[in-house]
Amino acid sequence: NGMTSDAHSSSGKLLMDAANIPSLIAAPWLNYCDIDDETYQNTRDFALSDDNPYFYVGTYASGIGDPHDSISGLPNPHKEYPVVWPMSIAMQGLTSNDETEIDTCLDYLMDLTGGTYVMHEAVNANDPSEYSRDYFTWPCALFAELYMQRHFYQVT
């Protein structure tokens, strides 16, 4: 069993998590639940899997995208064109106790700047030079928090 955030389909079920915050993956960061909560962990496992239609795997990163992707111009979801949101990757790291996963998220984020060295709203995970918003402070702040947490505070 997992958490739900929205139910708009004709069946009353919409199985997904999107990149924006608040999101299901952000629940512990928002103090909604404990990071070790079983229901949350089931939800997190789903959100970070191919079962989530907005989870994308690319050459430079894997992560959650969003129905409001403004890069591809394709109908969503579009697994063949993996557009991830850096804020969701930062949130994945911020809601992890696994140092390897946190380091992977930091690496992904640094690889997704498209040579600008700042975070963007959405990025093509196969070609980081394709992105929306030249500079987006929200994921920049989340990246800074994740970096500080990993390198200056003990991850518990």
Positions of the model-derived regions?
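C-terminal capping/lid segments that line or modulate ligand- or cofactor-binding pockets
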Residues: 14-38, 79-156
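Extended ligand-binding clefts on enzyme/binding-domain cores
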Residues: 1-88, 96
